[in-house]
Amino acid sequence: MENIVIRPSTIEDLARLKQIFSVARNYMSKTGNPTQWTDGYPCDDLIMNDIENGDSYVIIHDSSIVATFVLRSGIDPTYKIIYEGAWLNDNPYATVHRIASSGEIKGVFHFAMEFAKQKYSDVRIDTHSDNKVMQHAIMREGFKYCGIIHCWNGDERLAFHYSKNICLASRQ
């Protein structure tokens, strides 16, 4: 799709990001995942922190913000311990969190993952066991299921890992 731009989020984007997160919460609820993002998650402070740390990005189509995601490099504390499996490797990685779409265009997950894969050789992501739509999208982008991690609040998430070196080796 043409006319797609990905750039870091700014404070000026906050109102639009909140709208997009609201749309995403409603979509998750309607598609069998009503408990992943509850009570207004993510809160304004978390969104602002992501922006201020340079981890929040927006996907723009024809000058309109249509999606957002967090791409953070470095060790994610919730990924230090994985149950019922193992990460593909111990290489440095980036983590994708809080990906959300306005629903205005298709393919935003693909655009975000291509962006992440261009910047990092190893990318990790997790999702709720009820989020079948996201699980399918993650697997379609070449991620491998690795096991279960626990969020800071103790909730379980299914953990996935993309490694460029492993994906390239499996194609040969």
What are these regions (language model features)?
Residues 53-69:
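Conserved beta-hairpin
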Residues 25-45:
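Conserved GNAT-fold acetyl-CoA-binding loop/helix
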Residues 119-130:
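Conserved GNAT acetyl-CoA-binding A-motif
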Residues 4-19:
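A short beta-loop-alpha structural element at the N-terminal edge
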Residues 101-118, 136-140:
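Conserved acetyl-CoA-binding loop-helix of GNAT-fold acetyltransferases
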Residues 4, 64-68, 94:
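Glycine-rich phosphate/pyrophosphate-binding loop shared by adenosine-nucleotide-utilizing enzymes
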Residues 126, 144-158:
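Conserved catalytic-core motifs of GNAT/GCN5-like acyltransferases
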Residues 70-104:
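Conserved acyl-donor/pantetheine-binding loop and adjacent beta-alpha core of acyl/acetyltransferases
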